[in-house]
Every structure is written in structure tokens, then in C-alpha cells.
UniProtKB/Swiss-Prot annotation:
It comes from Aeromonas salmonicida (strain A449). The keyword Cytoplasm applies. This is High frequency lysogenization protein HflD homolog. Belongs to the HflD family. It is found in: Cytoplasm; Cell inner membrane.
Length: 203
């Protein structure tokens, strides 16, 4: 099994983790803080020497590997159609973003600002979350089509929940960038799903 295949599977797990956490926050108003931190931290890794540096280690995206196994596995279990919709939508949105050099330049500048702010604030501070959310709202969401988030209205009305959801969508886009850079494609998911599941189960 090639290193590139392993890296691609890792990138796809990163997308799955962001989608899973979006769903969790939208439904329950909260999610595992460590997983949230790991996904958001990946946004700030803009010049990795190797793919694994984006997430730090495989344990950082364990929820993503678990979601990958559940979604692509052939054990007959009920699939999460909503999570699949988020993953497909994020990949499609990133493909559009990749063609917009003007937006990519602005994206780099805004992410650098957050990196500087992190010297003074914790990554999960509401101010940082709000700034990450605004990057998604200002630069990525308008490219369209907009990703419709389903969840509990009581939670979705709360500003902090909205910030977390949008910040996680930004993290999902970051993982999609890595997936594309590693030549990830829909056909690979279809034809290599069994190998991807076997690999994901190791983590």
C-alpha cells in the first residue's frame, strides 16, 4: 500500500471528521473539544513539509477514520446520508475555490491573521472561532452552492454554534485542499473503498 494512498485516505478522513463535527454541533450544540481543536488547527497549517503535518498525527482525526469506516464499509449498517451530503458538498465547493486565485490569495492573508491572533488567544476562544467563521462566510460560502446545515433550531440560532459550524466547514475545505493535492477523486472512493476502510480501521 503506497504512502500516497495512505495520505489520501488520511485527507478523506479529515473531510469526514469536519463533516461529522458539523453534524454533531448542529444537532447537539457541542462536540468533543479535542477533535474540534485538532480539525481547526489544521486550517493554520498552510505550508506542510509532508501531508501528515496538516493533522499532526493520525489520532487527531480518529473521529474521521471512524466516520469513513461507517460510511464506506459494507457491513450493512445504516449510512449517514446527511454526513455524505456534507462531504460531497465540501469537495465540490473546494473544486470551485481552486479556480479562484483571487480568493485563494485573500484566504491566505486571513488565515495568517488568525495564526498571529493565536499567539494571544486560545484556538477555541470565541473571538478566534468568530474570525474563522467569517473567513468561511466572506470568502468561501459566496462561491456557492451554499451548504445547507440541518440541526436543532435552538442550537443553530446561537452565535457560538454558528461560529463553530462555519469554522468546521473551513476545516473541511482545508482537508479537501489536501485531498485534491494528493489527486483524490470520486472514482478512487468508488473503486478503492475497501482498501480505504481497511486502512482506516487501523487508526
Amino acid at each position: 500500500m503506497s504512502d500516497k494512498f495512505q495520505d489520501r485516505t488520511m485527507a478523506f478522513a479529515g473531510i469526514c471528521q469536519a463533516a461529522y463535527l458539523v453534524q454533531k454541533v448542529a444537532r447537539d450544540g457541542t462536540c468533543d473539544e479535542a477533535s474540534l481543536r485538532e480539525s481547526l488547527q489544521s486550517v493554520l497549517v498552510t505550508d506542510p513539509k509532508q501531508p501528515l503535518e496538516v493533522f499532526g498525527n493520525h489520532l487527531a482525526i480518529r473521529d474521521g477514520y471512524r466516520a469513513l469506516v461507517e460510511q464506506l464499509g459494507s457491513d450493512g449498517s445504516q449510512k449517514n446520508a446527511e454526513l455524505t451530503r456534507y462531504v460531497v458538498s465540501l469537495i465540490a465547493l473546494e473544486r470551485k475555490l481552486a479556480k479562484r486565485k483571487d480568493i485563494l490569495n485573500m484566504l491566505g492573508e486571513r488565515i495568517s491573521q488568525i495564526g498571529r491572533q493565536q499567539q494571544h488567544f486560545d484556538l477555541l476562544d470565541e473571538q478566534i472561532l468568530a474570525n474563522m467563521a467569517s473567513i468561511y462566510s466572506d470568502l468561501i460560502s459566496p462561491i456557492g452552492p451554499r451548504i445547507q446545515i440541518a440541526g436543532t433550531p435552538l442550537f443553530l440560532q446561537q452565535p457560538l454554534v454558528q461560529h463553530k459550524v462555519r469554522a468546521l466547514l473551513l476545516a473541511g475545505i482545508r482537508a479537501c485542499v489536501l485531498w485534491r493535492q494528493l489527486d483524490g477523486s470520486r472514482t478512487q472512493i468508488i473503486f478503492a473503498r475497501k482498501k480505504m476502510v481497511e486502512l482506516a480501521k487501523r487508526f
